[in-house]
């Protein structure tokens, strides 16, 4: 009988060890970014590096996409749990039938802007009549530009649109176009300034376009009750708050894991993006989303304005 006691103890220890390992094991989540890692993703990187995801039992895999158009589609297909996307894109893709829903906000203001050379001939939007405007993505950017021009008595037919792909700042600097639509105010403006060609920006939200969330977190709409998502948003909020409270330390953490981004452009973009992060990533302004949906319908980008609850939610 006495010789069997150690066996019982060993068995008990093995059981307790197994249970402990299961308790420690992290729930895994895959989040596909909208683009390669950059300062727009700062709260996600900080939440990762400070252990905020780990502290709530999550292992979050942050993946840069091979194709920047693919993240929402991969989520809709069940290939990833979450993706970083854009509010305007969400409305259009839901209208097209993709089963997506917004569960959080990363960047709560527009970053998009209409940019020209500060020392060039464009001083006001009205000066763009008869000029060349570069763009990288059609659809929403065309509609946004049209509204901005109309406010100053110009039709989109009064300008020449040129597809410059993603070479927005270089196209202005080289003189190939007089302005570009779709330039991110935290990047292209800094890129131009660094090479001694400062820009002037016109902001859509000041020129007739309703404000919107530039970057959001989307999930598949039949997965909104996944308990991992609530934990994810809670950890993301901690990442944002740490970033706001400790911007310099956060920058050092960021470049520690992404050494290739330790340059003047990203340092300036970091500074300019911080005030634009959503302090409450999980909060949802339904009226704001409803208003933007109506705007897209007026511009002919969507046919209907479904209830906000169909494509955006505030997790409980």
For each feature predicted by the language model, list its residue ranges.
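Bacterial N-terminal signal peptides that target proteins for export
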Residues: 1-9
């Amino acid at each position: 009988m006495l010789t069997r006691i150690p066996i019982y103890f060993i068995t008990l220890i093995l059981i307790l060890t197994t249970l402990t390992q299961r308790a420690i094991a992290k729930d895994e989540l895959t989040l596909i970014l909208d683009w390669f890692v950059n300062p727009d993703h700062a709260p996600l990187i900080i939440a990762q590096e400070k252990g905020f995801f780990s502290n709530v039992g999550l292992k979050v895999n942050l993946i840069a996409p091979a194709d920047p158009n693919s993240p929402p589609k991969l989520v809709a297909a069940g290939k990833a749990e979450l993706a970083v996307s854009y509010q305007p894109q969400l409305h259009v893709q839901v209208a097209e039938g993709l089963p997506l829903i917004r569960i959080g906000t990363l960047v709560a203001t527009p970053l998009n802007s209409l940019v020209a050379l500060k020392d060039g001939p464009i001083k006001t939007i009205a000066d763009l009549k008869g000029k060349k405007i570069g763009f990288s993505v059609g659809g929403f950017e065309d509609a946004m530009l049209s509204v901005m021009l109309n406010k100053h008595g110009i039709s989109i037919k009064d300008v020449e649109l040129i597809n410059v792909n993603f070479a927005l700042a270089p196209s202005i600097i080289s003189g190939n176009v007089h302005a570009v639509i779709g330039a991110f105010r935290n990047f292209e403006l800094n890129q131009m300034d660094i090479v001694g060609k400062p820009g002037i920006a016109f902001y859509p939200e000041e020129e007739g376009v309703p404000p919107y969330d530039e970057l959001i977190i989307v999930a598949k709409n039949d997965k909104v009750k996944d308990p991992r998502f609530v934990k994810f948003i809670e950890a993301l909020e901690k990442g944002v708050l740490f970033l706001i409270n400790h911007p310099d330390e956060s920058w050092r953490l960021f470049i520690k894991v992404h050494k290739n981004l330790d340059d003047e452009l990203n340092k300036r973009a970091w500074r300019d993006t911080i005030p634009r992060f959503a302090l409450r990533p999980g909060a949802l302004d339904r009226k704001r989303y409803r208003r933007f949906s109506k705007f897209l319908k007026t511009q002919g980008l969507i046919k209907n304005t479904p209830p906000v609850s169909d494509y955006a939610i505030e997790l409980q």
